[in-house]
């Protein structure tokens, strides 16, 4: 039979209340007593009844992390940052991969409600209105990472970078290198609450601010995989000669480079290419990819710290963090 809290108290020769204080890290217990209790716990192989504890405290010390695509290189570092912080504060994590499927998003939100999680870190390429409503109906602290809602006083707390400004800087970087036929391969800007969609706005503004006309023949919208970069560039180069490409993520950029190579176009001799994210393979791909670096680990850790503060009724210093980004210069630009 499994040891109970009474058994631990008897073994350590303390009260049940003292054992409870030790388990809950209450500071009033002196070190000698705490040591005796911990030795008794180890000797008896005591495991607290999590279900009973959660019913009493209305806390499970569990946080749900929802990501849109576990196969993407972008999200693991965010999850690592979030999980490292959750471990510091003794929270467990439930990881939910939605595969960019809205029905799976809905299912996981229901699962997290059933699991009585204390909070949710939510990542999604596009926050559909019904998903936002389901998250609100949870009535559980929720922080959005990588994306945010439109400006609203009731918007969920968030951690992002300024994607439009980062894109603007990337395109300006290409223009300063003498390029003026700059293609764009990315996500349809009409998608609402989509972090990648607004990258196009930065691309467009940089061109217009430099008196470069917007050429629809140089623009292709699609998904966020390498094949989308390959397909997009194959369409563009059949219509126009280009001297640069800006892509909404590194995977697209790598697919674009492959398409250029297959068509006898050298990168960077003939065409400069800039990506977005600075995923691991961007530094080992050939040529090494010039890209916008998102602080993925920090996005996860900042998001988790903010969430835990909200769970514990503390006021975060900020509800909408916009973190810094960098242009990482490598070999895909002259």
UniProtKB/Swiss-Prot annotation:
GO molecular function, one term: transcription cis-regulatory region binding
One Pfam family here: LacI
Record InterPro entries: HTH_LacI, Lambda_DNA-bd_dom_sf, Peripla_BP/Lac1_sug-bd_dom, Peripla_BP_I
DNA-binding region: 5-24
SMART domains per record: HTH_LACI (SM00354)
Keywords of the record: DNA-binding, Transcription, Transcription regulation
CDD domains registered for this protein in UniProt: HTH_LacI, PBP1_CcpA-like
Source taxon at top rank: Bacteria
Positions of the HTH lacI-type domain: 1-57
Function per UniProt: Involved in the regulation of amylase production.
Protein name listed in UniProt: HTH-type transcriptional regulator RegA
């Amino acid at each position: 039979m499994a040891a109970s809290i009474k058994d631990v108290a008897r073994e350590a020769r303390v009260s049940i209340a003292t054992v409870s204080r030790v388990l809950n890290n209450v500071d009033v217990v002196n070190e000698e007593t705490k040591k005796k209790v911990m030795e008794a716990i180890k000797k008896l192989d005591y495991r607290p009844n999590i279900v009973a504890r959660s019913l009493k405290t209305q806390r499970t010390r569990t946080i749900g992390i929802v990501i849109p695509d576990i196969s993407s290189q972008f999200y693991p570092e965010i999850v690592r940052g979030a999980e490292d912080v959750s471990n510091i504060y003794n929270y467990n994590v439930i990881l939910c991969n939605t595969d960019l499927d809205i029905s799976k998003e809905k299912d996981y939100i229901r699962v997290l409600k059933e699991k009585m999680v204390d909070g949710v870190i939510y990542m999604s390429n596009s926050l559909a209105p019904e998903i936002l409503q389901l998250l609100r109906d949870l009535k559980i602290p929720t922080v959005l990472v990588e994306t945010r809602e439109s400006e609203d006083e009731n918007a969920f707390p968030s951690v992002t970078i300024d994607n439009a400004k980062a894109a603007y800087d990337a395109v300006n970087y290409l223009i300063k290198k003498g390029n003026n036929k700059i293609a764009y391969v990315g996500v349809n800007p009409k998608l609402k609450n989509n972090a990648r969609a607004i990258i196009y706005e930065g691309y467009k503004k940089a061109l217009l601010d430099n008196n470069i006309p917007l050429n629809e023949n140089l623009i292709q919208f699609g998904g966020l995989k390498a094949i989308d970069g390959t397909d997009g560039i194959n369409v563009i180069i059949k219509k126009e000669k280009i001297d640069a490409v800006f892509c909404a993520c590194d995977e697209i950029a790598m697919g674009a480079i492959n398409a250029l190579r297959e068509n006898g176009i050298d990168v960077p001799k003939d065409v400069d290419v800039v990506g977005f994210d600075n995923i691991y393979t961007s530094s080992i791909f050939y040529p090494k990819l010039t890209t916008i670096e998102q602080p993925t680990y920090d996005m996860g850790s900042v998001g988790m710290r903010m969430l835990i503060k909200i769970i514990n009724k503390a006021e975060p210093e900020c509800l909408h963090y916009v973190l810094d980004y960098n242009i990482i210069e490598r070999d895909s630009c002259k």
